[in-house]
Structures are given as C-alpha cells and as structure tokens.
Amino acid sequence: MAPKKTNGFMIFVNEWRKGRNISIAQAVSHCGDIWKNMSAQQKGPYNGFAKDANVSARAKVEPLDCHGRPLSAVERENCEAAEREMNMKRNIERIVLEGKAQHDLENTKFIFAAFNYFTKAIGNDIYMPAEFAACKFSLRSGRGPVYSSHINPGQLIFGQASDAQHHTSTTHQLPLPPKAMGESNMGSLYVNIVKYLRDCQGAGNPLVVFTTAELMPVVSGCFRYLQSDSDEVGEQIHVYDILYLFYVLKKEVMDIADLPHANINKCITDNFFFNDFFEYYSNIACQFHEDNDRGKYCTHSMVSRWCYTFCDYMCGDLAIKPLAGKHMPPVQEQKFCVTNPDKSMCGNTSYNSVSSWHSDVKQEPDSDYTPEDHSVFSANLTATEEFPSLSGRRPKPTHRHPPPQKGAWNVPAAKRSARDFDDAFNMTR
C-alpha cells in the first residue's frame, strides 16, 4: 500500500499543536473551521511545505556497500582507477614503441625506484619513508649508478609505534625514529631526488619511475610525504607498473630479433619476474642490510635485481654481451677457504696414486694392500654363487605338516552333531 501524501492542512494542524497539550483528533476538529476561513494566500506556505515533503518521500535512498559508502561513489572510484590504469599502459607502450621506431630500443632509458617505509597513516595513503633507491637502466648499458639514501623522518606518527615496530622487524629492520639513520631534511631530499630524476629523463620529458604493483602506492605516498616538507613546487612524478613494462618490452625485443612471440603473455613474464633469481646474491645491497643479512628487503638490492632480471630475460635475444656488475651481479667472492691437512700428521710418508676411470686410490709403498678397481662389473651371470639372494635360495620342502585338528567349535553349524558337542566337553587327564 502506497504511503499517504502529506497535505497542507496537516502541516497547519501539526504547527498549531506545538505547545498545546491536545490530541490530533481534537486539533483536527478545532482547526477545520480555521482552515476553511483561511485565504489561498494564507494556505500557500503550508501547501508548499507539503509538496516538498512529498517530493522528498518519493526520492529513493541510495544503496550503500558493506562499508557504508554509496555504491555510486564506489563505482565512480573504480571507473577512475580503471581509466588511470589504461592511461598508464598506453604511456608505457608509447615509450617502448618510440624507442623501437627510432631503432634504438636497447638504449631506451628507464628509471626503477623503490621505497621502504616505517608506517602508514590511517585514513589516507601517506607513508613515512625509511629508505629510497633509484637507478637508470637500459638493455645496452645495463644497470647504471644507484642513487640510494636512508631517511630519518624525525618522529613517528602518533599511535603508530607498534605497527611501525612490527612492520620494520619483519622486513628491512632499519632502526625506528628518532634513532633512524640517513637524511633528516625531507625538503632537501625531495629536491635532490627530483634533480636526479630530471637528469636521467632529460629536459621536456615527464618524470616517470617504474616499480612493482605492490610498491606503487608506497612510492606515491612517500613522494607525497617528502613533497609536503618542500617549499618548492615540485614536478609531478608518475609511478608506473614495472611488470607491464617487462611484458611489453619482451614482446618488442622478440619482434625486433624476429623471434616467435605469439606464446608470450603477461602471466609468463610475471612468473619469470617473480622468481627473482638474484634474490640471494651478495654485494648488491647497502652495507647495513649486508651486515644484517636483510638484502632481500633493501631498496638498493631491489632496483639492482630488477635490472639484472630484465637483462637476463632479454639481452640474449639482442645478442648483447652481459657484463658483471651491469647486466648481472658482480663476481661473488668465496666466503670459505680450503686448507691442506696438517703436514705433521703425514710425516715423510709418500703415496703412489692409482687411478682408474671411476676411482682414485692411494697406496703406501710398504703396505700389503693391493688396490682393486671395483668400477668394472666382472661377475659371471650364470654362476649361482655370484647371486646368492637370487639363484642360491634354499629349496622349498616337499613334505607338508598335517593340518591341525579342529574341535567342535571350529566346525560349521550346519555340519555339527550332538556327539561333537559331547566330545568337546570331555577332558582328558
């Protein structure tokens, strides 16, 4: 049943009842004569209020999601996010295709960047940075010099000490503020980072850095945190997905090399990237993380490993000779040493080496031991004594023991008789 509409008379009745201890029925009977004697001009405001109330009642209440947000706002945010992602992919494809059109794709420069953070502010996407690293990369030159810095933001966000301690202890293990290491002037650090990015990108080009999808909100939030303490109006820094760059660049590299690439899809390239074959290499992280065995979480190590992964997957297609420290990690130093046995234990004993294809036996001159070469099989396959477990088994006995006698209780019920039961209870002495 549709709800009753509000009319001007009831608006007048409710207004007249205010301050009077009277029921609605009494008010209606009393106000009826007054309403009849009122002019159209006097009734106009009450009729207008009633019309507005009816319009508001007919308006639908917007549905909400489980977090109490209007669905229209959620859909609008999703559309904006999808549009941003589409624009990002188009820009990545444009950068790669421009290098391919100039026949200089192997020299196209990309900047990889990563941030470590202490904690994240509640209610927004601001992250408190702890460490930053960035490097310039190209397939021909490999990894360029790495710009890295530890960051000391001064004080943690109020109420976030526990979260910061938990996150830090499970990842990079950098000391918490105010005992943090590194640069403490956020404005100066931001200016230096922008200057470094501008020198790498060149004048007139937008500032674009590449990082993983997981670190994209972290990198954007840390840049906003640093920019908030800078007095200068900084340029906008675009943060793009390195995984999509990895996929597009691989496709174009194989196309240039005239290699079949129809079976290359983003799942394959993502899987290769996430394998992170250089994760446990040493001497590619900062000194702090090398000493504390946390190179996996070091930003210096992250950007270096990304460069090595790109080179490992694509340089072979373009016949680019890999160089240690550029296209692959530097030569690993041995962390162990091999020492000879104590000469005092050996004395002046000399040994004659007796070598064979699979063995290397040493014999002392004064010993009666004669080395034998056991690497050659010389047994006679027809001799039973050579294989006692197979052909030298004991013969099976020919006689069999008689089966044990069964009592009346072991005889099936259909074959039992009364005599069987009588014999079963007879006990021999």
From Swiss-Prot:
Q: Where is the composition biased (Basic residues)?
A: 393-403
Q: Would the keyword Protein transport turn up in this protein's UniProt record?
A: no
One GO cellular component assignment for this chain's record is:
cytoplasm
UniProt DNA-binding residue ranges? 2-65
Please indicate which superkingdom the organism of origin belongs to.
Eukaryota
Question: Which residue ranges are recorded for the region named Disordered?
Answer: 383-429
| Molecular function terms, GO-annotated | transcription cis-regulatory region binding
Q: Does the keyword Transmembrane helix apply?
A: no
Per UniProt, the keywords (alphabetical) are: Cytoplasm, Developmental protein, Differentiation, DNA-binding, Meiosis, Nucleus, Oogenesis, Repressor, RNA-mediated gene silencing, Transcription, Transcription regulation
InterPro entries annotated for this entry?
HMG_box_dom_sf (IPR036910), Maelstrom (IPR024970), Protein_maelstrom (IPR039259)
Give the protein's biological function. Involved both in the piRNA and miRNA metabolic processes. As a component of the meiotic nuage, plays a central role during oogenesis by repressing transposable elements and preventing their mobilization, which is essential for the germline integrity. Repression of transposable elements is mediated via the piRNA metabolic process, which mediates the repression of transposable elements during meiosis by forming complexes composed of piRNAs and Piwi proteins and governs the repression of transposons.
> Can you tell me which family this protein belongs to?
Belongs to the maelstrom family.
Instruction: Return the protein name.
Output: Protein maelstrom
Protein species of origin? Drosophila grimshawi (Hawaiian fruit fly)
Tell me what gene encodes this.
Answer: mael
